[in-house]
Amino acid sequence: MEKSLFDTKNLKITPMMKQYLDIKDKYKDSILLFRLGDFYEAFFDDALTVSKILNIVLTKRQDAPMAGIPYHALDNYLKKLVDAGYKVAICEQMEDPALAKGIVKREVTRVITPGTIIEDELLTTENNYMMSLYETKDGKISCILTDSSTGEVIIKQMESIDEISDFLQTHRVSQIICPENFYDKIVNIARVLGIFVDKLDDWYYENDIQTIKEAYGLVSIEHFELGEASKPLCATIKYINYTLNRQAKLKVPKTLDESKYMTLDSTTVENLSLIPGDKGKNLYDVLNKTNTPMGGRLLKWVILHPLKDRNEIEKRLWYVEAFYEDPLLTNEIREYLNGVYDLERIINRLEYDSAKPKDLISLKTTLEVVEPIKEALSTNEKLIQLAQMLPDLSQIKVKIENTLLEEFEGELGEGKIIKEGVSKELDEYRELLYHSNEKLKEFEERERAKTGIQKLKVSFNNVFGYYIEIPKGQVKFAPQEYTRIQTLVNAERYTTTELKEFEQKILAAKEKVEILEKTIFKQICDELKGYTQDLRKLAEMLSWIDVYSNFAYVSKLYSYSKPEISDSEFKVLNGRHPVVERFVDEFVPNDIYMSDELRMYILTGPNMSGKSTYIRQVGLIALMTQIGCFVPAQYAKVPVFDRIFTRMGARDDISTGKSTFLTEMNEVALILSKATQKSLVLLDEVGRGTSTFDGISIAWAMSEYIYNEIKCKTIFATHFTELTELSEGYSGIKNLTVDVKETPDGVVFLHKVVEGVADRSYGIEVAAIAGLPESIIERAKEILNIIVEKSDLEKKVGVLKEGQMKKIKATKKSVPEGQMKLF
């Protein structure tokens, strides 16, 4: 943190201020919210920051700038501070100020950071990841991705900073922790992406296996097979221990294995509009009809991590088909899932001793639908296995049911949450506490009868507690055992031994009710912790049931069909773009056929004709197959791709200062270096960022290299009609175009992809449709005619004649290494 603007040396230091400064010294990098009565106060620089961000009044206390937050509104203000990129240390009063001898004891009980939030009020339903990074001796980067709110832990090995940057753009990472020597390498990328970075001392990354064992409660962790990941995992656990002020509780780590999951780079995620982002409509929003927060999070994970294992893909499709073929069952299951709460986060709050009574009621409500779900699934032969994988936790439901009231008001400790009959002692104190008015009324009536003073009344205030009040004119009738405690203009106030004893009982009852109710609640929470593993298994299974039934529901709703998995053939009849079709009145379907032999298409056609939609549609159908969903097509046979690469559109990379063309070439270079024969490559307008001659040359050479060397399935949409000549030299390259109909009123784009080559670009017609002034359109037509008349395009561009093609065919052997440097 920056040096303080305030010098506290000349400040008159009270015991309370000394306590504040001592605690602040331990949390210099955090905003310290210091509990004073009903407020959390910030002082000095923190006060200025809090006042500015929260737009609250800045005041003073003994010349120290001060800004206060009401304790009951803390969560609302906390979110704003954390969203602004600050760590916040919460300092609580650890004893009742009324009972404290001297200065009230205070301690920091929690440090809130963007990546360690577990409080439901501060979270959305999406994952909230923290990334821990550690650079290994061989220059690779070991990464641990953790969601503290769910306990999820993911291990991933990265090759470079660029790979980290790519990953950060596709996953919801709100915080990065790293050693000091790695901070400068990541901080600029993080700032561009709005991610908070905390650099840690080296001891966090010491390979302390005991730290990991304690977090998991295990004697051995050899089966985790952590390798270098143990260091960033250690740092993660220690950091969570520090921020939550308690032992980290995490799930067994999952390795993001590239042999199992397809890697999707951020360019492809953006180009295919897979998840919500700046471009609006996306695949996740179209497919997401899930009924639980857990299912929604899992769906996003599934979309971003398509499977590469054919058996696993077919297993998912098997379950989806079972739901698809039984729509009544699907609707029944989805109805039950509506009653499922965010079980993952409830479990974690239990583990961290931060669960509230409403969490247990939500848990009970969730458990109430498990048996009906199990029974419903068991009626379908294909889904019996899912039913059998749901653990029986009815004993938890009964325990909560027998302990907590279904509906309650107030806070824990007020005696309004635990059922009657759970604790005889609690019941007795609650009776006294909540029926004291009746007792007082009886006492008042008895005293009136005894003294004959009909206007005698019993009341309470914070100064004297309970007292008897008698009007001045009747004071002479006050019994001798009444002790005067206050004289007013029109009355005298008294107390008695009996009234004092009654007051003490009520005060004791209030304290006892609070202690007993909190103790009983903690006991049941501690008991539930013993079921953590089963509860996590239940949460996982309910999430998958939600995703499977969701895929079936969406597939039925949108008329998707089950794809067939093939060895190599890629055949789609009447395929549609799953996102675009949802937002147009009528969508024109198209086919695709590719194989090992026919593996490249050159797609030409005018702007607005639908070229980009078509190639994206092909990519999305492939991806949807590999996430285990039905696809928008009449029929689909799809191979398992190891990667889907895209290069589309023109854009600068503002974060690195790269031009449109350099950005384009970097993306192409990635494709050429990473693609294999099992990849799907989708290219749109490569080479448009430079001169026409250079662009055609690069696009031609690149197409040859992909066809001859990589041999993967490729669709190349381009305005360079010269590239269609490639089909004359290579039997596995075909030309496609998007059909256009010319009418007296103008051009009509039919959006139908057919074999052939575009004979015109129709750029002027598109400009007219876009609304350019008629004078400009007419002038453009005149200029076009002049250019056409005076140009010999074949000579200028050097389109290859039949004889020249023989020379080109010779390049099929290989592409010189030097040529690759162009990319």
UniProtKB/Swiss-Prot annotation:
Keyword Nucleotide-binding: yes
Pfam family membership, one: MutS_IV
This protein's UniProt keywords: ATP-binding, DNA damage, DNA repair, DNA-binding, Nucleotide-binding
GO CC terms in record: cytosol
UniProt-listed InterPro entries: DNA_mismatch_repair_MutS (IPR005748), DNA_mismatch_repair_MutS-lik_N (IPR007695), DNA_mismatch_repair_MutS/MSH (IPR017261), DNA_mismatch_repair_MutS_C (IPR000432), DNA_mismatch_repair_MutS_clamp (IPR007861), DNA_mismatch_repair_MutS_core (IPR007696), DNA_mismatch_repair_MutS_N (IPR016151), DNA_mismatch_repair_MutS_sf (IPR036187)
A biological process from GO: mismatch repair
Keyword Hydrolase: no
Positions of ATP binding: G605, P606, N607, M608, S609, G610, K611, S612
Single GO MF descriptor: mismatched DNA binding
Domain of life: Bacteria
Function: This protein is involved in the repair of mismatches in DNA. It is possible that it carries out the mismatch recognition step. This protein has a weak ATPase activity.
HAMAP family: MutS (MF_00096)
Family as reported in the entry's similarity comment: Belongs to the DNA mismatch repair MutS family.
This protein's name: DNA mismatch repair protein MutS
High-level lineage: Bacteria, Thermotogati, Thermotogota, Thermotogae, Thermotogales
